[in-house]
């Protein structure tokens, strides 16, 4: 039983006859550099990676059962290749501040185009779904005072292709589509102060905001005919917190 539900119906997965195991071979090469500039400590990591997938699994919608549930068949595609570069860096002064960030550029392609909906006019697709070509993150901490600390953090997700099954009122039927999502930058801020109650007991009070720019999916499905799997981007809209 697939976890998604579309239009009030479930998605049931069956295995294709002769389904083979999926295998992968991965290679990577990296350089890790460290250097101090006085009190400032730095680190840079550069990595290249390459993964070849053989008989990669794909899900193809092949029809419906008597109860109106979607039947998805798990098949072997010809293969796929995932490759790219990863960059990570750190800079900081001990007991004062620290910044860490990373960024990845990658390509995720099937060897030959794959159809994910047999009864659809959509062309076969080489690009893997839900695999952005770029993504990154950063975290930083600044000790403003001996017991007062600020943290700034964030993640970046580039555009990606997402499958979407929606209700078409003109044809009175469910229709398959591919959506190119926007990119998202989800940034948050946290301030924390530590009170020393005794030599062995501390109390920390904190407050902040997550997803400061309210970078959030704007076209969520609603209603009984929604596609429960059509969700992408940050999990929460702007959120204030304290504790």
Where do the model's predicted regions map?
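Residues that define the transmembrane beta-barrel architecture of outer-membrane proteins
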Residues: 23-27, 81-83, 132-136, 183-187, ...
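Extracellular loop and loop/strand-boundary signature of outer-membrane beta-barrel proteins
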Residues: 12-17, 70-76, 118-127, 173-179, ...
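Residues on the lipid-exposed face of transmembrane beta-strands in outer-membrane beta-barrel proteins
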Residues: 19, 29-33, 87-91, 101, ...
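Membrane-embedded beta-barrel scaffold of Gram-negative outer-membrane proteins
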Residues: 20-73, 81-83
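Gram-negative outer-membrane beta-barrel transporters
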Residues: 43-53, 69-166
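Outer-membrane beta-barrel translocator domains and adjoining extracellular loop/strand segments
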Residues: 1-6, 56-64, 70, 106, ...
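Outer-membrane beta-barrel proteins
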Residues: 31-37, 44, 93-95, 107, ...
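C-terminal beta-signal and adjacent terminal beta-strands/loops
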Residues: 1, 52-54, 147, 156-166, ...
């Amino acid at each position: 039983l697939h976890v998604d539900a579309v239009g009030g119906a479930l998605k049931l997965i069956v295995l294709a006859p002769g389904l083979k195991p999926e295998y992968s071979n991965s290679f990577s090469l990296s350089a890790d550099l460290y250097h101090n500039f006085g009190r400032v400590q730095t680190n840079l990591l550069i990595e290249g990676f390459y993964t070849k997938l053989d008989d990669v699994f794909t899900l193809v919608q092949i029809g419906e059962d008597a109860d109106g549930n979607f039947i998805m068949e798990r098949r072997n595609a010809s293969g796929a290749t995932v490759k790219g570069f990863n960059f990570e860096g750190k800079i900081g002064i001990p007991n004062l501040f620290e910044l860490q960030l990373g960024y990845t550029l990658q390509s995720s392609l099937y060897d030959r185009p794959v159809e994910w909906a047999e009864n659809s006019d959509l062309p076969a697709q080489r690009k893997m779904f839900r695999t952005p070509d770029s993504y990154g993150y950063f975290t930083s901490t600044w000790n403003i005072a001996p017991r007062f600390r600020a943290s700034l953090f964030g993640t970046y997700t580039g555009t990606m292709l997402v499958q979407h099954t929606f209700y078409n009122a003109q044809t009175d039927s469910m229709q398959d589509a591919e959506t190119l999502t926007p990119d998202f930058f989800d940034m948050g801020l946290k301030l924390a102060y530590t009170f020393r109650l005794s030599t062995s007991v501390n109390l920390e009070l904190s407050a902040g905001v997550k997803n400061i720019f309210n970078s959030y999916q704007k076209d969520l499905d609603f209603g009984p005919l929604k596609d429960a799997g059509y969700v992408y981007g940050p999990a929460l809209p702007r959120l204030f917190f304290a504790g």
